[in-house]
Amino acid sequence: MDQARISFFPDGLRVMIIDDDAKAVRRATATLSQLQYAVVATHSTASAGLRALSGDNVVEIQAILCDVHKVVSSGFDFRRVVESELRIPVIYLLSKMEEEDMVAGEDAEFLNHLLLTATYIVRKPLNPTVMARLWRVVAWRMYCLEERIQANVAANAGAGGEDDDDDDDVVIVEEPQVHFKVVRRTSGGSRKRQLTINVVDDGNRGSGSGGGGGGGADANPTRILQHITSNLQEFRTKHQKKDMAIERPLISSDSMFLKAILPTLKISPCNPLILTGGIGSSSVAAEAFAGGSSSAAPLQIPVFQQQSTGNGNTVISFSNNASPMAMRAPTDNTMISFNNVSAAPVANAVISFSNISRSAAMQAPAARGQHLSGDVQQLDFPQQKLYFGPFSYQGPPPPSMHNHINLLPPTSSPVTCSMDKGKVPIIELPYGMPVDDFLVGQTAYGGAGLSIGATDAAATAYPYTDAPSNNVATGCLMVPRMGPAFSITEPTVVAQGEGIGTGVDAGTSEKNAIVEAPNNPAPLMVLDQVAADAAMDVEEDIMFSLESLLGPDYDLLPMEDVSAPDTAAAGDAAGGSLDGEEGGMDIGWDLDLDDILVENVNDFAFLDNLAGSE
């Protein structure tokens, strides 16, 4: 044990005693001397001991034994001040208190605080066995104080040198080229901290804060400002590029509508709207007309190739693969052929644009093995899905459209519905509607017209107005009927007149002309049913009998001609009668229509019967 104590305190443990009881001080000094603890100073108050420790003639002291009641009377925490500032452990001495020595109020609270935060407490009188282990307590506390002080210095340096006790302290961290200094303004309402970073060379560290430190302080903020400015400029550049990518306006090549209508427009290759250097291989048909060369030529328009023949015809071929294809152009007309192996085939799908006034249908060449001019052989290729319009949703056509589709000749004025004697009407519809959308009750120009809400087997008119034909927006697509002609039931038409005894059919000539129409009508015709409906719509004075309106399921009461004489006399006076002279129907009851209630069960209930039942 002595060897361990000597290793920590080779000159012995040097102790200061603070107590106003002289007898207790002498007794404590004798006990400590036996344990080889040297008592170097004694003081009666804590303030006197603190002044002695802070003076110039201070002696080396390694531990302080202080009566806790003297600390209470001093009014400050003696242990905290000495241990934090002088790094000397303080051990409190606690004596048995008499009634007159008891404290109360704030002193009692302060005493409890001192005892709770004390490093070590020893009761008086001193026990030699307890005091023999005192050197261990002192050695451990000295080590803790050294470590705590170093930790506090490092923490203050990391936080920028902030010190709670003194605002004007300067903490210098021994690191190369960096000095931290905190300046706090006490004048004014708000206190602001100013951090200055001084860059000092190793060669000028001992020369003071003269010219070297000032020059570094002046140059460093400029460097920091340049660094921040460059980062901000890079940040702005990145965001500007991102905004430009998001807000990039659509160019002409991005529009699917332009890509679809460019083949139908006569634009020179130098037009900026047309993309040069198209993708894929060139059209084999164009190569064949050019001389049969198999070398790939650059495309002026990426979706089609256009070539004029010697006879004034134009062939426009669409091709998405490299297989050879050539179409023979009909005489004095223009043919558009499609070639895409991924599309569904359509039998004999030909779109013809007539540049002349005739309305004859264009037919595809029947022979598949014929040779064109320049020894170009026409080859078979998969039939193509046909689109009506520039957008993909306007196709494919329904089964009733698997026929030749022709364009009408130009008309001088928009006609909603026109019909000649013995011919079916021609209906003109607006362009831009999908194929599967049918108009009901409205025509191309907003007026009431024919009903086109029929099924595939019924009449259907597909809009294709505004098609380019000599720069005139004309034409509509019509489908011939696919089934037998229909006829409507002959209506009973009754008109007032003299000498007429039976009903007259106003639409007999039109109906007969429709029924006698051939089974294979010419193009640009609709079904007979639609024509008959159109003929009936133009009539204004059409009347039906009550039996035709009610139908055969109604059970009418037996009619009695009880008022025939009166009705005949009234008819002679008025110039005619519907029941007497014209042979019309007779009403067998004298009740008004307001006296009859028509129920959902198709029965007639009279008001008199209802009143009697009630």
From Swiss-Prot:
Domain Response regulatory positions: 14-139
Stretch list, region Disordered: 193-220
GO biological process: cytokinin-activated signaling pathway; phosphorelay signal transduction system
Membrane-spanning intervals of the chain: none
Comp. bias regions, Gly residues: 205-217
Top-level taxon in the UniProt lineage: Eukaryota
Record key words, sorted: Activator, Cytokinin signaling pathway, Phosphoprotein, Two-component regulatory system
Residues with PTM 4-aspartylphosphate: 67
Residue runs in coiled coils: none
SS bonds (residue pairs): none
PROSITE patterns on file: RESPONSE_REGULATORY (PS50110)
Post-translational modification: Two-component system major event consists of a His-to-Asp phosphorelay between a sensor histidine kinase (HK) and a response regulator (RR). In plants, the His-to-Asp phosphorelay involves an additional intermediate named Histidine-containing phosphotransfer protein (HPt). This multistep phosphorelay consists of a His-Asp-His-Asp sequential transfer of a phosphate group between first a His and an Asp of the HK protein, followed by the transfer to a conserved His of the HPt protein and finally the transfer to an Asp in the receiver domain of the RR protein.
SUPFAM superfamilies, per database record: CheY-like
GO annotation, cellular component aspect: nucleus
InterPro entries documented for this protein: ARR-like, CheY-like_superfamily, Sig_transdc_resp-reg_receiver
Reported function: Functions as a response regulator involved in His-to-Asp phosphorelay signal transduction system. Phosphorylation of the Asp residue in the receiver domain activates the ability of the protein to promote the transcription of target genes. May directly activate some type-A response regulators in response to cytokinins.
Similarity comment text for this entry: Belongs to the ARR family. Type-B subfamily.
Protein name as annotated: Two-component response regulator ORR33
Species assigned in the record: Oryza sativa subsp. indica
